């Protein structure tokens, strides 16, 4: 049976039809002796996530539940039930690219709302109708910057996700686009702005950074923008943890923002599908890859939506196209749209604050390697054993530990990247600390369970 809530005006109409002014009058004929004149002895209301977590804990008495502290570009966030309810509707689930606008107004409307919300989150003027994922959005953003500036060289920070850098390298190799990396500060884990300035030249068309970066550190976007713009390059800012946008200042100093929306109700999955985005300042709108949905008027003067710009090779001549994005990602983008709608501006901020609080609670017991400010993940040194050996021990305790960094950063072979989200329970964090260190915590941080 569906639950159909009633508005206050609807309640008044129903009471008037019954000839009463309050719901209590409907029960006035019942003797006081049989009426309950106190509130029911019920616990306070809890959120949907807490209800699911309550029953999951009961179910885990008969199952093997592992606590996970993995992040590194794919994050364990709660997925509201409403997301599946909406995206499983046939008109969304079975539809393809909305080539014929007159019969695809529903799909086009949701894409338009998606673009609007992405612009609000990123501080940009225009957002496209999604990309394959964050990793492929990065080279698309780099090529876009090269086209816009007429300069073919790209500088990218070593604090950008290593696998994103690999994807960029694959694209760049076949585009004849030279890519050079610049370093990070060993103490803070953030951008080495002096190294960036040394490597900048008049042939550089794009500077690419990530915030929060791969180590979880919040980067100096404004300072990087000043260095890039001084030499006529565009600044591309990447994000892999979209929830951070609910709390951190939007990267409005960037020219292009590219990122991954997996955190917005897209389940962690090896190989995807995920949803990437590119958002830009308005003057670069004609360089944006993929599709843009715009608002217009139909022949009767009614509001209507259409594909305003479609610079992909299915729509225009191949040599004129900006990209070869072909798979319809609108369904995955719809998941993120429903997520953003369910949480709203304040809800997303509260979600981000929960992530921040839990990660800092964990950091108060595990000493972070870097001094830079971080969001919901940070780097820790493994004491007395390698991160790989530590993870083997943790698995025996039903704990999936952090990501060993040696495979990506040889200089950090003794360290691992650990993440905490709103899904991370305090008991699990305490268990991780107990399993990794014998040192008691000296700092107390308030955090909800």
UniProtKB/Swiss-Prot annotation:
Phylogenetic lineage: Bacteria, Pseudomonadati, Acidobacteriota, Terriglobia, Bryobacterales
List the gene name: gcvPA
Q: What does this protein do?
A: The glycine cleavage system catalyzes the degradation of glycine. The P protein binds the alpha-amino group of glycine through its pyridoxal phosphate cofactor; CO(2) is released and the remaining methylamine moiety is then transferred to the lipoamide cofactor of the H protein.
Describe its partners and assembly state. Answer: The glycine cleavage system is composed of four proteins: P, T, L and H. In this organism, the P 'protein' is a heterodimer of two subunits.
Query: Highest taxon of the source?
Result: Bacteria
Group of enzyme by EC: oxidoreductase
Query: Could you give a single Gene Ontology term from the biological process aspect?
Result: nucleoside metabolic process
Q: Which family does the record claim for this protein? A: Belongs to the GcvP family. N-terminal subunit subfamily.
In which organism is this protein found?
Solibacter usitatus (strain Ellin6076)
Q: What is this protein called?
A: Probable glycine dehydrogenase (decarboxylating) subunit 1
The UniProt catalytic activity note for this protein reads: N(6)-[(R)-lipoyl]-L-lysyl-[glycine-cleavage complex H protein] + glycine + H(+) = N(6)-[(R)-S(8)-aminomethyldihydrolipoyl]-L-lysyl-[glycine-cleavage complex H protein] + CO2
Q: Name one GO molecular function term.
A: glycine dehydrogenase (decarboxylating) activity
List the coiled-coil residues.
none
């Amino acid at each position: 049976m569906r639950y159909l809530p009633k508005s206050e005006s609807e309640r008044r109409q129903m009471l008037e039809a019954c000839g009463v002014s309050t719901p209590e009058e409907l029960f006035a004929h019942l003797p006081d002796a049989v009426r309950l004149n106190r509130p029911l002895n019920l616990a306070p209301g809890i959120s949907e996530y807490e209800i699911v977590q309550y029953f999951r804990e009961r179910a885990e008495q008969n199952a093997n539940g592992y606590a996970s502290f993995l992040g590194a570009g794919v994050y364990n966030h709660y997925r509201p039930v409403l997301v599946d309810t909406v995206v499983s509707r046939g008109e969304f689930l079975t539809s393809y690219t909305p080539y014929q606008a007159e019969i695809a107004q529903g799909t086009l409307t949701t894409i338009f709302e998606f673009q609007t919300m992405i612009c609000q989150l990123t501080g940009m003027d225009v957002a496209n109708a999604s990309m394959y994922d964050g990793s492929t959005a990065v080279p698309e953003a780099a090529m876009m910057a090269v086209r816009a500036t007429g300069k073919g060289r790209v500088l990218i920070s070593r604090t950008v996700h290593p696998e994103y850098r690999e994807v960029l390298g694959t694209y760049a190799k076949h585009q004849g686009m030279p890519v050079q990396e610049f370093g990070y500060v060993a103490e803070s884990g953030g951008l080495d702005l002096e190294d960036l300035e040394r490597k900048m030249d008049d042939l550089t068309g794009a500077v690419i950074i990530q915030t929060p970066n791969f180590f979880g550190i919040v980067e100096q976007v404004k300072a990087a923008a000043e260095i890039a713009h001084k030499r006529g390059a565009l600044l591309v800012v990447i994000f892999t943890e979209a929830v951070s946008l609910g709390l951190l200042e939007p990267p409005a100093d960037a020219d292009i923002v590219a990122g991954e929306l997996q955190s917005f109700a897209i389940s962690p999955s090896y190989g995807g599908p995920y949803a990437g985005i590119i958002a830009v300042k308005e003057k670069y709108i004609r360089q944006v890859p993929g599709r843009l949905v715009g608002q217009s008027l139909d022949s009767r003067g009614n509001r209507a939506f259409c594909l305003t710009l479609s610079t992909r090779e299915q729509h225009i001549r191949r040599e004129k196209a900006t990209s070869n994005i072909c798979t319809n990602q609108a369904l995955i983008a719809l998941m993120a749209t429903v997520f953003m709608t369910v949480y709203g501006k304040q809800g997303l901020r509260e979600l981000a604050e929960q992530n921040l609080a839990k990660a800092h609670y964990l950091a108060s017991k595990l000493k972070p390697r870097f001094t830079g400010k971080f969001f919901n993940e940070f780097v820790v040194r493994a004491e007395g054993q390698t991160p790989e050996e530590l993870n083997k021990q943790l698995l025996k305790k039903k704990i999936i530990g952090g990501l060993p960094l040696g495979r990506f950063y040889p200089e950090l072979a003794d360290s691992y990247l650990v993440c905490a989200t709103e899904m991370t329970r305090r008991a699990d964090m305490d268990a991780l600390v107990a399993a990794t260190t014998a040192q008691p915590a000296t700092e107390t941080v308030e955090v909800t369970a």
